[in-house]
Swiss-Prot record:
GO molecular function: ATP binding; proton-transporting ATP synthase activity, rotational mechanism
Family: Belongs to the ATPase alpha/beta chains family.
Name this protein carries in UniProt: V-type ATP synthase beta chain
Keywords: ATP synthesis, Hydrogen ion transport, Ion transport, Transport
InterPro entries (UniProt xref): ATP-synt_VA_C, ATPase_a/bsu_AS, ATPase_F1/V1/A1_a/bsu_N, ATPase_F1/V1/A1_a/bsu_nucl-bd, P-loop_NTPase, V-ATPase_su_B/beta
Species: Coprothermobacter proteolyticus (strain ATCC 35245 / DSM 5265 / OCM 4 / BT)
Keyword presence, Ion transport: yes
GO terms for biological process, alphabetical: proton motive force-driven plasma membrane ATP synthesis
Classification via SUPFAM superfamilies: P-loop containing nucleoside triphosphate hydrolases (SSF52540)
Domain of life where this protein originates: Bacteria
Gene3D superfamilies for the chain: 3.40.50.12240
Function: Produces ATP from ADP in the presence of a proton gradient across the membrane. The V-type beta chain is a regulatory subunit.
Amino acid sequence: MIREFRSISEVNGPLVFVEGVSDAAYGELVEFQLNGEIRHGQVLETTDRFSLVQVFEGTQGLTPKTTTARFLGRGLTFGVSEGILGRVFDGLGEPLDGKPQPFVDKYVDINGAPMNPVSREYPAEFIQTGISAIDGMNTLVRGQKLPIFSGSGLPHARLAAQIASQAKVLSSEEKFAVVFAAMGITFEEANFFIQSFQKTGAIERSVLFLNLADDPTIERIATPRFALAAAEYLAFEKDMHVLAILTDMTNYCEALREISAARREVPGRRGYPGYMYTDLASIYERAGRIKGKKGSITQIPILTMPEDDRTHPIPDLTGYITEGQIFLSRDLQHKNIYPPIDVLQSLSRLMQRGIGEGHTREDHSAVSNQLYAAYARGKEARELEIVLGEAALTDLDRLYVKFADRLESEFIAQGEDENRTIEETLAIGWRLLRMLPRSELKRIRDEYINKYLPKVES
């Protein structure tokens, strides 16, 4: 039911206090009318005396005496259909590509419906990103939420665009889509993402939601929810496997902190609201698979760690909720290695659910484990060499140092347009393992060595 009020008592920054509203709902949409101009807002807090509303377009020019507030009795919704594929929207679901609104099949609440834990199906099946450091050693699984922890100046935007353009499921019979949400990005970054999707042709199977740095703060809070509402529709009503990429969650959390400060809430760690964990969970937990549904939602949230601090509240809380992490390394970046993924610091907790016979290849797990062990030993020997000099190393230590160097330059490093299949990734792994004596391949069964190593040698 629509209710109209002319009882605005205070305008404070982006916030408006409307008195005499006792029945407003949290998240309810509000229209403000001033001299024929209409602005939109959302209820952030409600009491028996007043409602606190944040205005999307800002409050400049709003005056308490001449502004009318209309409470619309509904929350934010997004009109969905398969026509949203190939489109670019702003952070509030309005077309940004100059085209008209797509045909609407239905309107869905951007907050979605909570998944019953009993109805969830365990994440499984392999998603190929075309990036060896992920596919080979930190495999992404359908229904998983696997964040990328980056830092200022690292190429996470390029990596996100590459994953979005290359990712696919191996079965050609299953439909795949990408939902991409960017929060607080610059105009230059927005152009980069749009051009990257168009150049690779990935735009045809993708939906983009772009919130710019100069857009209202409250829009930044809504952007990932619009994206996930679109993802849920495509996954659970159109039977698609959807990869949702959310960047940059640090900008999202900064918006949370800004709104919390404007509401004069008691701050938590480093000024972030105490409910940030719950708020992040309401986004990350929308990934998954549902029993009886063919589709799935896989999430890759991307965040920049302030001052590269992994104990910062944003990466810390994200790590608790998600199922692993991909770390980008400044050291590898300084070596001009792209993508600079630190495979030893990275982890995919659900990797074993999506690899092996019937998913990728029978030797995948063994090759991955051996690469991890050999690379770790090579890095240890490299550090020892720095402290004590090369003379302190044994011949085997020197071999492992060479192995570590080649793994970084041949396995981790790849071109920005290089899309490797899982077979190519494993072949590179076997080629590197060939450097080591057979007696050192202790994590691989003899039958796999006999089957795959000769192929590499030939």
